[in-house]
Each structure stands twice: as structure tokens, then as C-alpha cells.
A protein has these predicted regions:
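ATP-binding glycine-rich phosphate-binding loop
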Residues: 4-5, 17-43
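An alpha-helical support segment within catalytic cores of ATP-dependent transferases
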Residues: 8-19, 125-161, 169-177
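A conserved alpha-helical element in kinase catalytic cores
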Residues: 9, 34, 47-92, 97, ...
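Active-site beta-strand termini and strand-to-loop segments that position acidic
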Residues: 40-46, 171-172
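Residues forming the ATP-binding cleft of Hanks-type serine/threonine protein kinase domains
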Residues: 89, 102-103
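Active-site Asp-x-Gly
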Residues: 171-212
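Helix-rich C-terminal or lid/interface subdomains of diverse kinases
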Residues: 195-270
Length: 270
């Protein structure tokens, strides 16, 4: 559950203000789950997007802090896609990142939306980018608990891994910015497209339409169909297991249903 800005102690706020100057307004972010606090801060130095996470103890990082550390390490190396990281603060048991504020809206992935062209252009560019050495996570490890052999998903391509509509910001002049690089990984390039599938289904595309849209990407059409089938099955199984938890949020159950639909489609179209 996300915390309010008021959860930040005076020591932390003072460290932030050393970068921003006096703060005039704080607008909490409506979505996202990789930080305890996320907000647009209006301050003397201008607007900045702030993400903060509380450590478990002075010596121990929690999952949100680890995510932010990972993002802070990666973002400077993906400047063609991500908002700039202006500063980092560690004080009072908190890690705080200050990002360039992007004046943009969340993308619309519904059928017929012009944003789909922007999404495609962004993904094409991402697939052509070199994976920085600082990207340490291997995407195939996500499914190691549900499959004996996950090597078909391995590779050296740069993967954002979460190009959902809320993470693709589109500015008034049509530029795109990819935010939330906490789980960027390296792997087979086509896996990025596989991870997009639930978001396209959720936006109203039929599975066959999703398959047609994905066919514009060389990495997808060149991938071994049996590898895509394997991915579809382990993707659905991992989300099914997550959704079995009685306390899981509604979006997890929905994601499990969407990945199941895609796996069933792949079985039927094989």
C-alpha cells in the first residue's frame, strides 16, 4: 500500500529540499507499486517526479528500496527512453529518487488508437538498443519455478519488461517516455512482446488481433513457435499461482485471466 508524502520525516524532507528548494505543492501519483511514495513535486527549482521507499532497517533494504536502487543504476544508461534521474537522496532510513518530470498522458492501447503506432515505434527502438552492462536481471529466471527449462527465454536483449499503458507517457507533441525501469532485464528480444500481450488483451484486442499486431516485429516472427508456446504456458502458470493467494489484489486475478486466455489461444491455433 502506498504511503502519503507526510510519511517522510523532516530529515528526509530536508534532504529533498536541498535539491528542490522550497516545496509549493505535492501531487500524489495515481498508480504504480514499486515505491512507498510517488508524487509530482512543484518546487522552487521546478517540477520533479519523486519516488521514495523506506528501508527495513538501517542495514537492510526492502523490496521497494531494492527496486529503486536497480532503477537508479539503470536509468542513466537508457536515456533515449527514460526521464532523466536528477538526484538521489538517502536519509532517515529512506531512499529517494528525483526524476525529470514528463508532461505527458498515459498511453491508450485500445483498438484503433493512434497510440499503438507510438507504442510500436518505441518497442522497435527498444529492440534495437544495446543492453547496458548494468542490467543484471535475467528475464528467464522469472519462470524457473514453473518450468524445468527456461533457456528459450534467455538472451542478451534489453527488456523493459513492463510496457503497460501507465508506464508509457506521451507528450503533447507525440514524444514517448518509458518510466519505471525497476525490473529491466536481459533476455530474448521477443519476450518483451510476450509481456505486452495481457495489456493489449485488457485494452480490448482479441487474441488473433494481438498476434497480428505482434507480427510487425522481426524478433517475434523469427522466434521459434515452440518457444512462444512455452512462454505462453509458463507466463499463465506463474500468474495462476499468484492469483491463488486469497489476499491477492483484483489486478493480479485479472492478469491471471488474461494470460490464461492467451495460452488457450496459442494451444488452439497451434
Amino acid at each position: 500500500m502506498r504511503s502519503d508524502w507526510t510519511a517522510l520525516q523532516p530529515e528526509v524532507l530536508g534532504a529533498i529540499k536541498a535539491h528542490t528548494g522550497p516545496i509549493h505543492q505535492v501531487v500524489p501519483a495515481p498508480a504504480g507499486n514499486h515505491a512507498d511514495v510517488a508524487a509530482t513535486v512543484h518546487a522552487a527549482a521546478g517540477r520533479v517526479f519523486v519516488k521514495a521507499a523506506r528501508k527495513l532497517s538501517e542495514e537492510t533494504d526492502g523490496p521497494e528500496v531494492r527496486s529503486l536502487r536497480n532503477e537508479a543504476r539503470i536509468v542513466p544508461h537508457v536515456a533515449d527512453f527514460a526521464p532523466r534521474l536528477h538526484w538521489t537522496v538517502e536519509a532517515g532510513g529512506w531512499l529517494v529518487l528525483g526524476f525529470e518530470h514528463v508532461d505527458g498522458r498515459h498511453a491508450d492501447y485500445t483498438p484503433g488508437s493512434p497510440d499503438l503506432e507510438i507504442l510500436a515505434k518505441t518497442v522497435h527502438a527498444l529492440q534495437g538498443a544495446r543492453c547496458p552492462d548494468v542490467v543484471r536481471m535475467s528475464v528467464e529466471r522469472r519462470w524457473a519455478t514453473v518450468a524445468e527449462d527456461v533457456s528459450p527465454m534467455a538472451g542478451g536483449a534489453l527488456l523493459h519488461t513492463d510496457v503497460n499503458p501507465e508506464n508509457l507517457l506521451i507528450t503533447p507533441d507525440g514524444r514517448a517516455a518509458l518510466v519505471d525501469w525497476a525490473h529491466a532485464s536481459r533476455g530474448a528480444a521477443w519476450v518483451e512482446l510476450g509481456l505486452l500481450i495481457p495489456w493489449l488483451l485488457k485494452a480490448g484486442h482479441a487474441p488473433v488481433e494481438v498476434g497480428n499486431w505482434l507480427s510487425q516485429f522481426p524478433s517475434w516472427t523469427a522466434a521459434d513457435a515452440t518457444h512462444i508456446d512455452l512462454f505462453s504456458e509458463v507466463f499463465a502458470e506463474r500468474w495462476r499461482l499468484r492469483a491463488e493467494d486469497s489476499g491477492c489484489p483484483a489486478w493480479v486475478a485479472l492478469h491471471a485471466d488474461l494470460t490464461r486466455r492467451w495460452a488457450e489461444y496459442r494451444r488452439g491455433s497451434g
